[in-house]
From Swiss-Prot:
Protein family per UniProt: Belongs to the ATPase B chain family.
Keyword field: ATP synthesis, CF(0), Hydrogen ion transport, Ion transport, Membrane, Thylakoid, Transmembrane, Transmembrane helix, Transport
Annotated function: F(1)F(0) ATP synthase produces ATP from ADP in the presence of a proton or sodium gradient. F-type ATPases consist of two structural domains, F(1) containing the extramembraneous catalytic core and F(0) containing the membrane proton channel, linked together by a central stalk and a peripheral stalk. During catalysis, ATP synthesis in the catalytic domain of F(1) is coupled via a rotary mechanism of the central stalk subunits to proton translocation. Component of the F(0) channel, it forms part of the peripheral stalk, linking F(1) to F(0). The b'-subunit is a diverged and duplicated form of b found in plants and photosynthetic bacteria.
Subunit annotation: F-type ATPases have 2 components, F(1) - the catalytic core - and F(0) - the membrane proton channel. F(1) has five subunits: alpha(3), beta(3), gamma(1), delta(1), epsilon(1). F(0) has four main subunits: a(1), b(1), b'(1) and c(10-14). The alpha and beta chains form an alternating ring which encloses part of the gamma chain. F(1) is attached to F(0) by a central stalk formed by the gamma and epsilon chains, while a peripheral stalk is formed by the delta, b and b' chains.
Protein's UniProt keywords contain Magnesium: no
CC terms in the record's Gene Ontology section: plasma membrane-derived thylakoid membrane; proton-transporting ATP synthase complex
Molecular-function GO term, any one: proton-transporting ATP synthase activity, rotational mechanism
Membrane topology term: Single-pass membrane protein
Transmembrane segments: 30-47
Domain of life per record: Bacteria
Organism: Picosynechococcus sp. (strain ATCC 27264 / PCC 7002 / PR-6)
PANTHER family xrefs: ATP SYNTHASE SUBUNIT B', CHLOROPLASTIC (PTHR33445:SF2)
Localization in the cell: Cellular thylakoid membrane
Protein name stated in the entry: ATP synthase subunit b'
Length: 161
């Protein structure tokens, strides 16, 4: 068995000694044609479909990015709109509270004013009643003083006679 390997090795060395680096015979153009056919087949079966898949994927990613940016912008707009509406509602609530407080203060002020007016009227009425009673008491006293002074005068005059 070793004999055959040695024989084959010597034959291979003898054949290479004849030619140089390349043999310019019919194999070179056949190899070039084979390479071109292989390149065309690879281009047709492998590179174009992969290139198309890459382009499709790139378009898909680009479209999704644009959609995502639009959705993000829409979400930001909605958030801003929500915050503006929330501020408006809070402002309206504060206005309603302020109006209610002002109205309550007005009602309290009206009630206090009414109570003060009523108390003043009662006081004036009481003062008038007191004045009327005083006048009547003075008249009564005056009548009693007159009658008593007449009685005293009659007793004094009657005692002198």
């Amino acid at each position: 068995m070793t004999h055959w390997t040695i024989v084959l090795a010597t034959e291979a060395v003898e054949k290479t000694a004849e030619g140089g680096l390349f043999d310019f015979d019919a194999t070179l153009p056949v190899m070039a044609i084979q390479f071109l056919v292989l390149a065309a087949l690879l281009n047709k079966l492998f590179y174009k479909p992969i290139g198309q898949a890459i382009d499709d994927r790139s378009d898909y990613i680009r479209t999704n990015l644009v959609d995502a940016k639009e959705r993000q912008q829409k979400a930001e707009d909605l958030a801003a709109q929500y915050e503006q509406e929330l501020r408006d509602v809070r402002r309206e609530a504060q206005d309603v509270i302020a109006k209610a407080q002002a109205e309550a203060q007005k009602v309290v002020a009206d009630e206090v004013k009414s109570a003060q007016a009523e108390a003043l009227a009662e006081r004036e009425k009481a003062a008038l009643e007191i004045e009327a009673q005083r006048e009547s008491a003075f008249k009564s006293l005056e009548q009693q003083v007159d009658s008593l002074s007449q009685a005293i005068a009659s007793k004094l005059v009657g005692a002198k006679l």
